[in-house]
């Protein structure tokens, strides 16, 4: 019985070599698990930037797998494509062609949780991001016909690699947009808190009638370079009023140049043209008190 499914990364023997990669396990009750006999199902890769250039024939390093998924992934069931989709960190090559430069957002899918397609690279840090920023991993969940990503933004230039959470959105789970770069969805707490250094999200928020609960893990220091073994960790909870992933907050005085005259204590929103020919109702999620 494969009612419960688990995806994890581990080292496994494949012919003559031992490789890291994607492994799976199944359970009938969620308590007793059995590892799937074939592993790894997808080979991963490891190393340091400046090592092998992909497909260099002078090197014999079978563990160098270009554009492979790495060791932090989250899996969901994609109701649109009717497949299991696994999102996570994926190695991207540097400007000089060397491997193991940074991590971007990768994806692979499977119909049976065993046979996984070649991973695709979906989204990467770009010229609008600081130089030392990359994605630690990118958990995705499907809600209200939209794909949301709780992207873990890793900044290696601060405190051994701190992580804050950026909200990403997609209409198809493949093409991703990052419209909220200037405001983190979940930010680290103060330096004396368990989540003052890094926040780790997942793909399973708890949806209730009036709120959405996001449980997360936290480190008091950076996630990749902290050598202080006195740092603490824990589990935190962030609560969002239901469906308020983003919003507008009024100001007491609006005096921008597009107005004929300043508006005092009046909330006004101007939207782009929207075609409403086939719609009967519009729902506004707002507090007008």
Regions found by a protein language model. Give the residues of each.
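Carbohydrate-active catalytic/glycan-binding domains of CAZyme proteins
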Residues: 1-289
